[in-house]
Amino acid sequence: MATTGKRHAKSQSTYAFDNTATNVTASQMRNALNNLADTVENPEQTTRFENEMDNFFTLFRRYLTEKASGSTLDWDKIRSPSSDEVVEYGDLNSANNSANLSKLAVLKLNGGLGTSMGCVGPKSVIEVRDGNNFLDLAVRQIEHLNRKYDADVPLLLMNSFNTDADTEKIIKKYQSHRIRVKTFNQSRFPRIYKDSLLPVPESFDDSLEAWYPPGHGDLFEALVQSGELDALLAQGREILFVSNGDNLGATVDSKILDHMIETGAEYIMELTPKTRADVKGGTLINYQGEVRLLEIAQVPKEHVEEFKSIKKFKYFNTNNLWINLRAIKKLVEANAIEVEIIPNQKTISHGKSDINVLQLETAVGAAIRHFKGAHGVVVPRSRFLPVKTCSDLLLVKSDLFYLEHGALVLDPTRDGFSNPLIKLGSHFKKVSGFQSRIPYIPKILELDHLTITGNVTIGKGVQLKGTVIIVCNDGDKIDIPNGAILENVVVTGNLTILEH
């Protein structure tokens, strides 16, 4: 007999037990959050904190309920999106109505730290190209747009409590630029113990490790609570272009802006064709007649390989999103934005010991199903250029791109080709290690694949072509000499160039 992969329905006695356990756990959490609120000493901070704890409790309660009911997607009901739910960028009208820029605001998600690349402070201040960091490039792009079209497109940064203070200092340097930069903070939620499901922090001003920013799905609530959404509407802004702060391909695109206004869509998600490097990326589906974002975490184990298939799920979410501001206001005020919860388990240092914690997060892309006329636009790969690792950093610093008004533009000789696949080993994980080992970026215009592992340094004026693999064993050292040209080679062993 064939199995369908569906779970057995829960018996009534199981439901009753789960329901009681859920109520007890929720009640304990509510009491703990009330106690936390009592520790706020500054009356100006009380309202915001209580509001955040209420929002956290709503999320926590929903997490418990969904966990108890075992609600999951029915894989058999998943369909590919229809032709009006995903449209090709090339089919959009090419007329450029610059007047529409008066309806636009740009938002960069700026809550992340640079710790994964070995840096202290906000990730957005890592230098990526010609002395510019992520924020510098975003400012230059929008400033150029404002000058060219005599516009006044504002830039908003959604910070977290981890990045806010540093970002405020950094943006002072843009005061003389032709751009308005505004910042606001996303929520600060308490981490919870994995075993007891109670909050880690014991007071409002407990250490930073006790708290977490709850993912970019918090954007809608934070926009409204900060007053920034009403301020944008008062300026006549209608559309918010949202992107990850580390995606260097996410520039303002008038074609998509015009298309959104023409169609009246409340939400547009930029998609791009999957490659084997993107098999874990979220994808758009049609589920019971509505457009939804399907993330790998929601996929039953037996269907993960199918989800990764490039044939069935051709596109993935770039997290470049165009969202109608009035629609956000209406949905938030009606408490109507309910998105999938992503439980994130971590081990953190707290006090003198390591503890296992849970943080409940949400993603902004998952809200697509609540907006009218929502659809995906399949954009060129050039609009997705994230910098997550030093391997990505090598790519964006290279001669593959040139800088034009803050935007990275691909060298025309690479048109039609995918970017080279670059894999740098653990010696290059931190920016400091990357910079000391590759002080001069090699020419990679003709490169297809690069792998470097071990104690390797690269000299000045090096060219890499085709497939280049450099493997240095433990205890050995490889110095690639100045001016070397490596083409379709594997370099192993021990190679040190002595200065004479």
Curated annotation (Swiss-Prot):
InterPro entries: Intein_N, Nucleotide-diphossugar_trans, UDPGP_fam, UDPGP_trans
CDD domains: UGPase_euk (cd00897)
A Pfam short name: UDPGP
Keyword Transcription regulation attached: no
An annotated GO BP: protein glycosylation
Active-site residues from the entry: K388
Enzyme class: transferase
Span list, region Oligomerization: 449-500
Quaternary structure annotation from Swiss-Prot or TrEMBL: Homooctamer.
Function: Plays a central role as a glucosyl donor in cellular metabolic pathways.
Name used for this protein in its record: UTP--glucose-1-phosphate uridylyltransferase
Gene coding for it: UGP1
